[in-house]
């Protein structure tokens, strides 16, 4: 089989990487105003889950559909996470500069809280892109799933952190970050949380059908 033949595994791989490249550039562009980053991440997860499920259509069109629809809630949630991150970073700097004044376990505790916040954030924007809910319940569900699916949550944290730490250690990787630094780790996360979302969707479907059963009789 010709590897460049339409439908070949190599051709499908190239198509997938092209979609991830386009999605990464659009997401990065919409993150530049900073305040819109939450909506951009939500839209990215919206597209990525469709890609994982083989439902992707027009990448840019799907992205901006979610971006517009979820902008308000995503922006509020993003501001909350930025405020939390700023608080943790300032506390960590304060503790590290005040060497000897604070217990040795305190810096580690702050880092653990930061890791939890990262896992909360991944679920938050991914769930916002998929489920209609209030800000409070989106956060509550993100926290609940983080702990109930802790192995998967830690797996997603690793998927996100390894490329980030690699870039910090090797700045020469900047071109990869620009081209794939958001979409590729995000795609990995979508592969991980897709089974969780499918279970939630099944539960919602069962509850809706139990509430409104088919009242037709067999004839």
What label would you give each PLM region?
Residues 1-110, 120-123, 127-219:
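Helix-coil boundary and N-terminal low-complexity module in membrane systems
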């Amino acid at each position: 089989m010709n590897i460049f033949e339409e439908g070949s595994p190599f051709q499908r791989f190239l198509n997938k990487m092209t979609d991830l490249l386009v999605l990464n550039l659009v997401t990065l562009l919409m993150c530049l105003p900073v305040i819109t980053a939450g909506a951009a991440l939500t839209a990215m997860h919206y597209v990525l889950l469709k890609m994982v499920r083989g439902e992707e259509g027009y990448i840019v069109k799907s992205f901006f559909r979610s971006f517009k629809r979820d902008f308000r809630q995503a922006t509020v949630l993003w501001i909350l996470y930025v405020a939390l991150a700023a608080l943790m970073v300032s506390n960590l700097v304060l503790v590290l500069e005040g060497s000897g004044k604070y217990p040795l376990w305190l810096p580690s505790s702050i880092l653990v809280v930061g890791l939890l916040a990262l896992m909360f954030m991944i679920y938050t924007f991914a769930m916002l892109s998929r489920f209609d809910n209030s800000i409070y319940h989106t956060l509550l569900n993100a926290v609940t799933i983080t702990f109930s699916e802790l192995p998967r949550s830690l797996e997603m944290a690793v998927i996100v952190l390894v490329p980030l730490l690699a870039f910090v250690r090797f700045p020469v990787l900047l071109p990869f970050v620009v081209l794939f630094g958001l979409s590729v780790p995000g795609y990995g996360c979508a592969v991980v949380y897709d089974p969780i979302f499918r279970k939630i969707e099944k539960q919602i479907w069962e509850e809706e059908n139990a509430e409104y059963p088919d009242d037709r009789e067999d004839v």
